[in-house]
Swiss-Prot record:
Gene3D superfamilies: 3.30.230.10, GHMP kinase, C-terminal domain. It catalyses: 4-CDP-2-C-methyl-D-erythritol + ATP = 4-CDP-2-C-methyl-D-erythritol 2-phosphate + ADP + H(+). This is 4-diphosphocytidyl-2-C-methyl-D-erythritol kinase. The keyword Metal-binding does not apply. HAMAP family: IspE. The gene is ispE. NCBIfam families: ispE. Keywords: ATP-binding, Isoprene biosynthesis, Kinase, Nucleotide-binding, Transferase. GO terms for biological process: isopentenyl diphosphate biosynthetic process, methylerythritol 4-phosphate pathway; terpenoid biosynthetic process. GO terms for molecular function: 4-(cytidine 5'-diphospho)-2-C-methyl-D-erythritol kinase activity; ATP binding. The lineage of its organism: Bacteria, Pseudomonadati, Pseudomonadota, Gammaproteobacteria, Alteromonadales. Catalyzes the phosphorylation of the position 2 hydroxy group of 4-diphosphocytidyl-2C-methyl-D-erythritol.
């Protein structure tokens, strides 16, 4: 018998407060040092457990993604396979975050799926076990599963909890799709930033090693960042295209948003060192 719908599981966006590329490994992946922080803007997912093993996804996204490529369904299937759970789930995604903008929305959706279904299926895997499943699907997924702001190293899987200031951000989503794979394959991408200790990294100005390359290739990103820099310290998150400015108060961030040119899209968000997903998980 199908159960009631379990509602309002958040999948928050993340920002890379800094992103340094330290080298390329023999397997083609890049060694990184980055600082992840969540924000309070989220996709929302609902789940209903079913007796049969089918996995069904309903989404508000206009773009159709093949089931085999959809991270939410791949995450649910991976949890089934890892645990031997013989039921399934019906899943509803309310997609609110920009896609492909460096905010981690797809990875966050997959992480929320793993965490929520682990609870609802009563499969009782630890966060570390869920993160190991998630890492096979995407390097950003473990940080969303663990749910704390983190200094990440390696390909992004080695995490250390940190507590950066929970500032207010104005995030602008330029009308551009930046391919993460293309950025990391570009010969002009800096790959030799020295590895530094966390205390040193936290005390120096923060930067994104991908930013100069992306700005040079995407005029929309350059325009958004140039506008935002007039109001606040600003930089790109991930490989873009989204950029963010830092404000000490919501009022300041909203005042800047009110001046946003009509051809740009943006939103104000609060930095969070504990993910809204963890808050939801701790509810009955």
């Amino acid at each position: 018998m199908s159960q009631e719908i379990s509602r309002n599981w958040p999948a928050p966006a993340k920002l890379n407060l800094f992103l340094h590329i330290n080298g390329r490994r023999s397997d083609g992946y890049h060694e990184l040092q980055t600082l992840f922080q969540f924000v309070d803007c989220c996709d929302q997912l609902d789940f209903r457990v079913t007796d049969t093993p089918e996995l069904i996804l309903h989404s508000t996204m206009s773009a159709v993604v093949a089931d085999s490529d959809n991270l939410i369904l791949r995450a649910a299937k991976s949890l089934q396979q890892a645990t031997g759970f013989n039921g399934g789930a019906e899943i509803w995604l309310d997609k609110r975050l920009p896609m492909g903008g460096g905010l981690g929305g797809g990875s966050s959706d997959a992480a929320t799926t793993l965490v929520a279904l682990n609870r609802l299926w009563n499969t009782q895997l630890s966060h570390d076990e869920l993160a190991a499943i998630g890492l096979k699907l995407g390097a950003d997924i473990p940080v969303f599963i663990h749910g704390f702001a983190a200094f990440a190293q390696g390909v992004g899987e080695r995490l250390q909890a940190v507590n950066p200031a929970e500032l207010w951000y104005l995030v602008i989503a330029p009308d551009a799709h930046v391919s993460t794979a293309a950025v990391f394959q570009d010969p002009l991408l800096p790959r030799n930033t020295p590895k530094l200790g966390l205390d040193t990294l936290l005390s120096q100005p923060w930067a994104n090693d991908c930013q100069e390359l992306v700005v040079s290739k995407y005029p929309q990103v350059a325009k958004a960042l140039g506008w935002l820099l007039e109001y606040a310290p600003s930089r790109m998150t991930g490989t873009g295209a989204c950029v963010f400015g830092e404000f000490s108060s919501q009022q300041q961030a909203l005042a800047a948003l009110a001046k946003l040119p009509s051809d740009m899209q943006g939103f104000v968000a609060k930095g969070m060192n504990i993910s809204p997903l963890i808050v939801r998980l701790n509810r009955p």
